Regions:
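Acidic, low-complexity proline/glycine-rich segments
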Residues: 1-36, 51
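Short, charged/polar, low-complexity loop and linker segments
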Residues: 24-41, 63-75
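Amphipathic alpha-helix face/heptad-repeat signature
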Residues: 7, 44, 52, 80-90, ...
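Short secondary-structure subsegments characteristic of cysteine-rich extracellular domains
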Residues: 62-94
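Conserved small/polar residues in nucleotide/adenosyl-binding loops
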Residues: 138-140
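Long amphipathic alpha-helical segments
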Residues: 96-112, 129-136
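Feature marking long nucleic-acid-engaging regions of large polymerase/nuclease enzymes
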Residues: 38-50
Length: 140
């Protein structure tokens, strides 16, 4: 009988895929020169927003699914509240994250704005999905 391969030891960096994650701030393929400190700041803040939007969407979808049940069991209320409290804390954090964004002066932003082409934060599909999802929660 052949020896079973030894399991790969999970590491912090491996679990979070840090090599991939931390290379995402370098800009698109062939992007040169490398982003300046101000552009890197801009990229990281916006990527962090998108990561938080991902979690907010998941939490809100879980809460909505539970609330749309024909009968919302009393035992499920703490879980629903947990999802909504987490979303509330994330929104609080996102508001503070704008304070970090405000450390980028308009002049500093204009120094690399042309590199963004016609792109805009309004293109965030997660933000659109969040708007639609929040509107749907009004009618529950």
């Amino acid at each position: 009988m052949a020896d079973a391969p030894s399991p790969v030891r999970m590491t912090y960096g491996g679990y979070l895929r840090l090599d991939e994650l931390l290379n995402l701030q370098d800009g698109p393929e062939g992007y040169a020169p490398a982003p300046s400190n101000d552009e890197l700041h801009f990229i990281i803040v916006h990527q962090a927003f998108e990561l938080w939007f991902k979690l907010v969407l998941r939490e809100l979808k879980e809460a909505r699914a539970a609330l749309l049940e024909p009968h919302v069991a009393e035992a499920s209320i703490p879980t629903i509240v947990h999802h909504l409290e987490r979303v509330s804390e994330i929104f609080r954090l996102l508001a503070d994250q704008w304070k970090v964004m405000e450390t980028l002066s308009p002049q500093d932003f204009l120094a690399f704005r042309d590199r963004l082409g016609t792109s805009s934060g309004f293109e965030s599909w997660q933000m659109r999905e969040l708007e639609v999802l929040l509107l749907s929660l009004i009618h529950i």
